[in-house]
């Protein structure tokens, strides 16, 4: 029975957020289903927002990185997709207009990665490599993200990093990522008697 006896283990907010973030990063780089990915991405964003308010730590928000003229559209599409997936009871026959959900996931995951460092003062291999992945593979990132010009100039130094397929092939083979992945997916925690 699931509820008999003591819990198998406990996780704190930091570990939960890290696991959601790492899962989202792996899903994005592996080019997995964007709808399932969106749920983990938005759960991480919600956790960051709630922790930020509770701990009094400022985090990076959409308002700081999305250009003002695109902010309302961003919010509408991002929230509509999440609410559609979360609240089937509201209108079970409704269809969802799908825009660039993978792009929304990639951008929100970048914010989640930055916010993990702000909230917990830590970086992981997943976070460092995801930041490089996003910067290298997002051809239109400069159109909607307010990063300093030096950031964009620096990307031109690494033209071979633009292929998402290359990242998909090598990401999990990077030793630091492999180590974090094994920790994140250690199911012995769930199966201990």
Protein language model regions, located:
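Short, contiguous, well-structured surface segments enriched in hydrophobic/aromatic residues
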Residues: 32-60
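Charged alpha-helical initiation segments
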Residues: 1-32
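Long, charged low-complexity segments
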Residues: 63-172
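Short, well-structured alpha-helical interface segments that form or flank functional binding sites
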Residues: 12-19, 32-43, 73-80
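Phosphate-binding glycine-rich loops and adjacent basic patches that engage nucleotide phosphates
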Residues: 1-10, 37-44, 64-71
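C-terminal non-catalytic accessory extensions
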Residues: 166-193
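Short alpha-helical functional segments enriched in proximate histidine and acidic residues
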Residues: 27, 47, 85
């Amino acid at each position: 029975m699931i509820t008999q006896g003591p819990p198998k283990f406990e996780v704190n907010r930091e570990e939960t957020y890290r696991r959601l973030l790492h899962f989202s990063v792996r899903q994005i780089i592996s080019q997995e289903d964007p709808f399932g990915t969106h749920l983990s991405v938005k759960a991480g964003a919600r956790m960051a927002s709630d922790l930020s308010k509770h701990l009094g730590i400022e985090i990076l928000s959409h308002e700081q990185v999305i250009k003002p003229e695109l902010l309302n559209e961003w919010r509408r599409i991002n929230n509509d997709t999440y609410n559609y997936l979360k609240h089937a009871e509201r209108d079970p026959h409704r269809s969802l207009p799908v825009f660039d959900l993978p792009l929304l996931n990639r951008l929100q995951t970048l914010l989640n990665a930055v916010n993990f460092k702000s909230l917990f003062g830590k970086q992981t291999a997943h976070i460092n490599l995801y930041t490089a992945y996003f910067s290298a593979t997002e051809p239109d990132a400069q159109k909607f993200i307010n990063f300093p010009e030096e950031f964009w100039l620096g990307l031109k130094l690494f033209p071979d990093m633009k292929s998402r397929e290359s990242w998909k092939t090598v990401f999990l083979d990077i030793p630091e990522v492999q180590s974090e992945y094994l920790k994140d997916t250690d199911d012995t925690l769930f199966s201990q008697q």
